[in-house]
Regions:
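Long, aromatic- and glycine/proline-rich binding clefts that accommodate carbohydrate-like moieties
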Residues: 139-143, 333-342, 392-448, 473, ...
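Short, polar/charged alpha-helical segment
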Residues: 42-66, 106, 162, 166, ...
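Glycine-centered hinge/linker elements that transmit conformational signals in sensory
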Residues: 199-208, 235, 239-295
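Short, solvent-exposed loop/beta-turn-alpha elements that line the ligand-binding surface or hinge
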Residues: 116-131, 175-192, 229-232, 236, ...
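A structural signal for short loop-to-beta-strand junctions that line the ligand-binding cleft
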Residues: 83, 90-93, 123-168, 347-354, ...
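Extracytoplasmic "Venus flytrap"/periplasmic binding protein-like
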Residues: 34, 52-134, 138, 171, ...
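Extracytoplasmic/periplasmic substrate-recognition and gating elements
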Residues: 32, 61-63, 86, 143-147, ...
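Hinge/lid segment of periplasmic solute-binding proteins
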Residues: 99-160, 198, 217-220, 238, ...
């Protein structure tokens, strides 16, 4: 994982920010050693965080604070965190949590409510008020969009379009695309920003090549595929992309904000939702054959793109750092980034609703007062202007408006131009304790549709019936 680039430049900036934010570092007569144990998924954003902490953090209390992190592979992360929490071992003071886990782990007594910490700290309150509401609501609130806060954003994330400039901007490909579709093949990031799903589908069809076919002026060394997005059975790897299609088509998933009167049946399987799922499924014909096996998750599409087997990939920003690193990517110098495609409305504008990625920090309920004080100071440092800029300079993202609206933010990474407009289109799925049952059954049903075993209507009828029954039993839907 590459954590290179501009970190040394920002050391002084971070130090200055700490002094400004906290009024300097106290030096008590007897400094204590405080260890904060944290569980995190192992990927670039958390590695960058640890690197910044090791190089720059000094506790305002004057204590010697150590951040002891367990880096856990993403595929195992939920299982291992859940096992630790339910075992009663109380190993972690903090964790980076997926937003969907909030309800289950809050109701089980593991995640601490933080309203009192926010109310007691004007600086922290001001920082959160400077945060875009979409990620703040997604990462912090339970119930979703309530005033009950449980998390601080660690790495906000959204889906964007990764594409191969050497392929789509090639003169021969440009000429042949115009001849076939009577329209220009988008090339520049600005042109790609205006790509709707219809053009995306055409590009997917156009760039399907077999080994030996001409591709950008030379024979393809391997089979080459037009497009990819998440369509895997594991965890939430089809649900998130499908949610975006449903919202763009004017449909909805079951909305916990409408409880207890909002139903699943008639909403989850509405005509708009069925049309959206059909749309999602139609595009899979221009994807690598692994899509028909249930194995095309976010990590697999990322791998395929970095191996040079895709023209375009709809992927979370959190994986982009490896794409521009020549040590991990064959296309590091042949890639550009644009906003995710959308559905073009009658007014000609693109509707880009999408399921937000990213994760918050959470505090465990058993953390003592001394640990909580150090955690809050750590979080304030993390969300401070200097640290957020340093994180962005190293490949991360910030949900703080005054940070990402700073003109220099655009210079840190080529995908940052997509960030501010993309945040406007983010929604989240369920935060309720029953999320896992909802997710597992939905993933199973979507996999049947993706692999060609049942149609879109049957799939959504099955999901709607299951959700209606489960949510009634749980008291989230009342007659």
């Amino acid at each position: 994982m590459s954590c290179k680039t501009k970190l040394p430049i920002w050391t002084a900036v971070v130090a200055t920010a700490i002094a400004l934010n906290f009024g300097g570092v106290a030096t008590p007569a007897l400094a204590e050693e405080v260890v904060l144990h944290m569980a995190v998924p192992d990927w670039p954003p958390t590695r960058i965080m640890k690197d910044l902490f090791n190089k720059n953090y000094k506790a305002p209390s004057g204590n010697h604070v150590k951040l002891d992190i367990d880096f856990i592979p993403w595929p195992d992360y939920y299982t291992r965190l859940n096992t630790s929490l339910t075992s009663g071992e109380k190993k972690y003071n903090m964790a980076v949590s997926d937003s969907q886990w909030l309800g289950a782990f809050i109701e089980a007594g593991y995640y601490r409510k933080i309203n009192d910490l926010i109310d007691a700290d004007p600086g922290l309150k001001a920082t959160l008020s400077d945060m875009h509401p979409n990620p703040l609501q997604a990462y912090a609130t339970y119930p979703y969009k309530s005033e009950n806060y449980y998390g601080f954003p660690q790495m906000p994330d959204i889906l964007i379009n990764y594409y191969r400039t050497d392929i789509v901007c090639n003169e021969d490909e440009q000429k042949n695309f115009r001849a076939k579709y009577n329209q220009k093949l988008p090339c520049t990031p600005e042109e790609m920003d205006d790509v709707d799903w219809d053009t995306f589908e055409k590009m997917g069809e156009f760039f399907m090549r077999q080994k030996g076919d001409m591709l950008a002026g030379k024979p393809a060394g391997d089979d080459f595929y037009g497009i990819a997005y998440q369509a895997g059975r594991a965890y939430n790897n089809s649900t998130r992309q499908i949610n975006g299609f449903i919202w763009q088509h004017g449909g909805n998933i079951w909305d916990e904000a409408q409880a207890p009167t909002g139903h699943a049946e008639g909403v989850v399987n509405s005509p708009e939702a069925v049309k959206a799922l059909d749309h999602y499924l139609r595009l899979t014909k221009y994807m690598p054959p692994i899509v028909k096996t249930g194995g095309m998750d976010a990590l697999k599409t990322d791998e395929l793109f970095r191996e040079g087997k895709l023209a375009m990939n709809i992927e979370y920003i959190g994986l982009a750092e490896n794409t521009i690193n020549p040590e991990t990517s064959k296309v590091a110098h042949k890639v550009a980034f644009a906003q995710m495609p959308g559905l073009r409305g009658a007014d000609g504008k693109l509707v880009r609703w999408s399921n937000i990625g990213g994760q918050p920090f959470v505090i465990m309920t058993w953390s003592d007062d001394k640990q909580i004080k150090e955690i809050v100071d750590f979080v304030k440092w993390w969300l401070s202007t200097g640290t957020q800029h340093a994180f962005a300079a190293a490949g991360g993202q910030s949900a703080i408006k005054s940070v990402y609206n700073d003109p220099k933010y655009l210079d840190y990474r080529p995908w940052n131009r997509t960030w501010a407009p993309g945040l406007e289109w983010q929604k989240d799925a369920w935060h309720i304790p029953e999320f896992f049952e909802l997710l597992a059954q939905g993933q199973e049903q979507y996999d049947l549709a993706i692999t060609g075993k049942q149609d879109a209507k049957t799939t959504l009828d099955n999901i709607a019936a299951f959700q209606e029954r489960l949510l009634k039993e749980a008291g989230h839907i009342q007659e």
